[in-house]
Amino acid sequence: MQPSRSFASLFNSSFNSSSSPTLPRTPPTPWNPADESCCSEPDTYSTASHSLPGYKICRRELAKGAVWDSHCHLDFLARKLNRENIKGGESLRMSLQSDGQRLGEKFGGCIANFCDPRDWAQGPRSQEVSKILTSCKEQSGVFLTLGCHPHFADKMDGFCVQQLLRLAKKMKGRVVAIGECGLDKSGKNRVPMETQKKYFEAQIDIARELNLPLVLHIRGAEDEAKELLEKKKVPANFRIHYHCFTGTWKAAEAWLGAYPASKIGLTGLVTFDHARSVHEVARHIPLEKLLLETDAPYFLPSGVSKESYKHTFSQPGHVVHVAAQVGKTISE
């Protein structure tokens, strides 16, 4: 099966053909229909192999051997582009058409994460982002997650919770998870912990009601997150994407022991020499437990050619660099 040409042309490569990374070979993840009970058409869906184990993606969207970006932020990316004075409805498309070679069969698509309620609930920003959501809905090779990042938990209210549930139901089949959500005790987050917990719990409830995976953002609050998941009686076999993991392999192993259906997401951080704990995780984690992410527009991979890509932020196509570095780390 060939990847969507319309999507591949939207997200062009940012590297010259002479420096295209070599992608690791990963075995396919078997599809167990019993794990996909929330699919309305279980015979037409599969868990994606290669870089999206555990996510429900229509089989017709999957390309054999293609790498998918399991986590990016197209709304944040669009605003980055606008700050660079790239205007008009084609700004995203224009920006990602670099002078490098097209990704072709190496890049399958992405899961775009919308985690700021101001972007999907109500207000002027939601009107702007609704155009992106509509485009994603119509675009082959783009799937969505909806939720509230702990940094934005103070922007949530009862209306937002209901709107999140409504949108996830309305876009069933295109929305493949709830989140990113979770708890963050880092110095960058000033939202009170009680507020974070309140809306993390609300999103757990929605994920369980719709039988969708959770995409978790956890910083310095792993014990609290586990306690809350236990309080909500989230079963050990619930599907969880532990996004942007930066801890040690010991910590990852402990999490997988508690929630064995989880997947661990590694970002472009893995391409940097100083990220030793992330390298350790890449070296030891079973491939079927691994998800590849760009977290675009964050974590521009170190291997991106400055000659062919002029921006200072990442884009979904850069997941091929993440895949290449993981493959290199495994082989060392």
Residue ranges and their predicted role:
Residues 2-332:
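Mid-domain alpha/beta scaffold segments of enzyme catalytic cores
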